[in-house]
Every structure is written in structure tokens, then in C-alpha cells.
């Protein structure tokens, strides 16, 4: 388990560095990220490289038992580069050229920029690639820029030509006869700005993804050619940010990382947990938090400080969801620059700020020997998966039909009730292998590719339960409407035995009577509603609309399709339900699929999550299961401790568990203080 911070030694005289490193060591830190914005210090003028200062910083850290994550500095090109080569600066959609002096203001597709990126990364890799004090590399920082230059337009046209081969195919897939958009020359195709042809917009998103992947792959290849095999490579992504397809980019990385900031307010674990799950799902591996806030940020409407103890909960919350590393941003704020008031561990006077005390407590816990040993080689392993697709998000966000329709909010609507019930979820690519899951949910999977159709049908035919929500199966892989009603693809419609007869953007909530638990439950649907039609005599309605707009009255709002011979089936939910109805639907799905909660009792605001050793049979000798219990509230809570049978799913008598954070055995009830954490393992 790694714990640390981002440090910028280039901001400070070398005479200060030893004091900083001593404070890191005292805080329990065993890793530090450096270098990712220091290009002008590494290469003050073209081709003149200065790494002695970096060598000194690395040695200071190493001598104090602190490993180094080395960042490539390519998010912040030096002024001499952008001045002499203005073509390296990105062109915004407005036609304005990005200014030097910010970050990520470069054009990632610029051949000139790529040349200089290769040079600096190669110099770093040759110098530090065989250095065992460096455990890994972070490439760049928070990819985000989209370039709209004429050069990018030409490369986009070439990309489309490679993909579609002929203009006839492109025109057909994009329905360009509409509004006389038909192209007779590849050079006629524009970069979409604002609303445009759905096929063109999706194609440009795919192109942007490829640009970033090429940019990243250049750095990956240079480092791998010069680095030790054990030096890993990652990038720090930004949660739900969607300018490119993260699944594509992470294929070339060893694992994914992300930067987690709360901003205004306080953390809601039911919302943040699924972003951890999203990041873990990029590679289906544990992840790192390369940045998280040490108290507050500086860019939110109200940059309030986290409550005392809240950061500890957040740290263990991340670990529970698969984080193997956690670093604060930043160690100390520079006297100048754009982020002067951002939270930090060290103040302007060089002394620890109040947050340093809590960070030290967190560090002592995360890096304690018994904790590290217990968490080693463990990861979250779940029975429920939620599917996620950038293509679907792009498709819906370009044509929401109701501006209140947010595909990420729909995903969270389905994930939150599981978090409240101590049931973890995996968030997977829509084309992922689904073997081993009891329940798959596809929230607003509007665009379904042939590969996804094959995966989903195989899953149901193999006995799985698949939930398709509103807007599933509207479009094909080119962002064109399927020539059939939802769920679109014939294979899915045949399995479902249900189709969407019509969809409605709602201006007012409509009544929905839910019957899935055997008794009517009065609820509502809002934003979006679909009128379902049962195609199979074996399909059954699970909910009906009440009197509303006349079009929905009395029609099915949810339905379960016929069971396949394997026992699998598809369930269609045609409404965005109110919270109480969503909760009751979740309970019904759990009962239908036999999903087992990580902890049988639940208390509002208390999270229970587990990490396990993959491949170990529950309860078998050598199996390792670590349970994280977090009180996210400011009140004392009590949580009954279950018997061993609740941990393994089998029979068993009352059992004893050890809290690794206190060294004490847990009694029959966990007494949780405000913002308290328990790390439980089975006692000998």
C-alpha cells in the first residue's frame, strides 16, 4: 500500500528539500510524485537537459524510504517551445489559440510537439529507466484538450478514410442525404462544432481518442524501451470526464489512476464509490489515486474544508474500492501560480498545516505492517456489474431529447441502492466478458455494438439476468437508429420478448404502479418514459403507468421477458423511477438473482465493503478477506457483527473478527465513532 503526495522541488531552494522529505517521512509517506510540470527546469533551453536537481531530489526521498513516481512533464511545455513553434498550441473550437502559461494547452496531434515530447521523455527514460528508486511513471497530467486546427481536420479526414474505405460507405452509415450533407471528396468533411450529424460527431470522438492514444503510446514505447520491467506506467484520469474513450487509452497502461476531488460540500460515498469502480473497470485491476484533496480545493464555487476525520473516511473508502496507492495534491503551494489557495499539507511558512496531522494519522494506518500484509494481492470481487459506454454517453448527450436526461445520473440511480445495501458493483465496458456475474445492469446503453450484442446475448443464454433500462438499444455502432424498435438488435428483442413501442420526454412526473415484489407500490417516473409492448406470451408486466398524458395510461412501464432454458432472462425498465421505487426494484432484483450482501445489517451512512484474494475459495485455507467498515457520518453508529456464515455464504457459528487498526477483537456490535473506520479480518 502506497501513501504520499505530489511534491514540486523545482519551486523551492535545494536547502529546503531535506526538511520537506523529513516531514513526509514523519507523516508515514512511502511514495512521492515529482516531475510532471517541470519541463522548463529539465530543459531550460532547447536540447540542454538538466537532471542533476531531479537526481538529488530522488536520492533524498530514497534515503528516507520514499519511493518515486516520476511524471513526464509534457502537460506543461516550456515557453521557448510554444514561442518558437506556435503550431504546438491547441486551437479551440472558437478558433482562438490557447495561450502559454496554463497547462494542457498543447495540441496532442501536432507532429512538432510529438517530436519534442519524444526527446524529453527519452532523456528521462535513459536517465531514470534503470533506476530502482523510481517505481513507476505517470504520463503527462489529466489529458483533456481537443484541437480544432486545419491540420487536425486533415488528419481526421484521413482517419475516416482508413475506417470507412469509401465515401459511399460513410454516406450510407451517416445518412448524409439528410439536409444534402452527402460528401463527394474526403476533404469536404468538417470537424463538428456544436450540434451536427450524429455519425460525424461520433466519428470525431473516436478520432480524438485515437489522437490521445497515439500521443500516449509514443511515451509508453519510449519508456518501455529504456526502463526496468518492474517500472509500471499509468496516467491520472478525471472520473466521468468523457472527451475520449478511457477503455481504449488504458489498454497501453499497466493500470489506471484518477484524481478525486470533492469540491464544494462533502463526500457522498454512494456517488464517489462508483467512480472508483469505473476507474478500476478500465483495466479490471486495482487503481491508484494519484491526486486527492488535502482539505480543500481552489476552483469550486465554495472551497470549503473537509470536516476533521472526513479525509480518513475517504482514504479508506478508496482502498475499499480497489485503490493501492493514495497521494495528496499537493505537498506545498507555490507562492505564485494559478493554484495558490488550493489545499496543501505544508503552509506558506514551510510549517505543517492543520490537515498534516490527519494525513499523518492516515499514513500510519495505511502503511502499518499488518494492514499492508492483509491488503496485499486483494481486490474487490463482486456479483453485480453495471455496464458503461462512452459511445452511448456521447450519443445521448448530443441528442438528450430532454435536457434533464443525464446518462451518468441514470447509471448512479442504479448503483446507489446497491451501495446502501453493502453490495459492491463492478463498472465494466459494454463489450466486457460478463462471465461469473449474477446480475448485469445496462443503464441507458443507447448505442450497442455487435460485440456488445454478442456478449449480452451469450450472458443471458448462459443463465444470467440482464436489466435493460430506458434508451437501451436505440442505435448501432455508427450512431444510426436501428431499423427496429428497442432494444434494437434482433437477438436482444427475441430474448427479451418485449419491445419499446414508444418513448416520451416528460414535462411532468407520471404515476407508476410497481408490482415486482408481489404487492402494488405507488411510485412515479420522471424525465423519460417508455411504453412497453409484450411480444411473448411468457413475458410479464412488472409495473404499469397510471393516468398521465393519455399515451402511457395503463401500459407496462417495466416487464420481465421469458426465461431462457438456461434460466437467464432480460428485464426491461422503461421508466426513470423515484427513489423509493428504485429501492424496491433493487430489493426485488437481489431476491431474484441471489446476490449476497457483504454485510447483512445496514445502517444509513455506514459503508461495508470487501477486498478478497482472487482465486481463493471463500472460507478455504489461505483465503484472505478484508472487510472495511466506514462511518461516513458525524454521529456515533452501531453495527451488529454477523456470524462467519455471513462472510462465506455458508453455514457457521458466531465468529470473532480482529480490527487491524486497533488490534482489538470486534464484539457482537461495532461501536463506530463519527468518521470512524474498522478494518476487519477473521481472528485466529
Regions found by a protein language model. Name each.
Residues 12-25, 117-123, 238-249, 307-315:
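Short, acidic/polar
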Residues 5, 24, 32, 61, ...:
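Conserved, mostly hydrophobic/aromatic
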Residues 1, 28-30, 62-68, 130-135, ...:
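Short, well-ordered coil/turn segments that N-cap beta-strands
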Residues 94-255, 259-272:
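Polysaccharide-binding and catalytic clefts of secreted carbohydrate-active enzymes
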Residues 8-10, 35-38, 71-80, 135-144, ...:
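Short, solvent-exposed turn/loop segments enriched in Gly/Ser/Thr/Pro and often Arg
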Residues 3-13, 37-52, 99-118, 140-147, ...:
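The substrate-binding groove and active-site-proximal loops of carbohydrate-active enzymes
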Residues 186-189, 229, 239, 250, ...:
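Carbohydrate-binding surfaces of carbohydrate-active enzymes
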Residues 19-25, 33-95, 219-227, 446:
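Aromatic-lined substrate-binding rim segments of carbohydrate-active enzymes
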